[in-house]
Amino acid sequence: MANTVFCKKFQKEMEALDRAPLPGAKGQEILQNVSKQAWQEWQHLQTMLINEKQLNLMQSESRKYVMEQMDKFFNNEATDKLAGYVDPDDIKEL
């Protein structure tokens, strides 16, 4: 049986990550408090934010922005919206 964690994003016991996704204390915090599903959803949003806002992760401001958005996402706070993005689940067939 897979390891589980109480996910702070979904507020329930869910499948845990296999290993810390980031180095250091932040990675351990995520490993102990974020489910595999929440991490995958964050990676999807992170990719969209980086692409839409044309972030250069070599710049400290961009890395700081991404980390702030990640914290907001996992704490169920509002994250920045992407201009013109429509969730595929919201599209109704014509």
UniProtKB/Swiss-Prot annotation:
Pfam families linked: Iron_traffic
Q: Which InterPro entries match?
A: Fe_traffick_prot_YggX, Fe_traffick_prot_YggX_sf
Q: Which GO terms describe its biological process?
A: cellular response to oxidative stress
What sections of the sequence does the record tag as coiled-coil? none
- Keywords associated with the record: Iron
Q: Which GO terms describe its molecular function?
A: iron ion binding
Q: Which Gene3D superfamilies match?
A: Fe(II) trafficking protein YggX
Domain of life, per lineage: Bacteria
Q: Name one GO cellular component term.
A: cytosol
Q: Which family does it belong to?
A: Belongs to the Fe(2+)-trafficking protein family.
What does the UniProt record say this protein does?
A: Could be a mediator in iron transactions between iron acquisition and iron-requiring processes, such as synthesis and/or repair of Fe-S clusters in biosynthetic enzymes.
Please identify the protein, giving its name as recorded. Probable Fe(2+)-trafficking protein
From what organism does this protein derive?
Answer: Marinomonas sp. (strain MWYL1)
Q: What is the lineage of its organism?
A: Bacteria, Pseudomonadati, Pseudomonadota, Gammaproteobacteria, Oceanospirillales
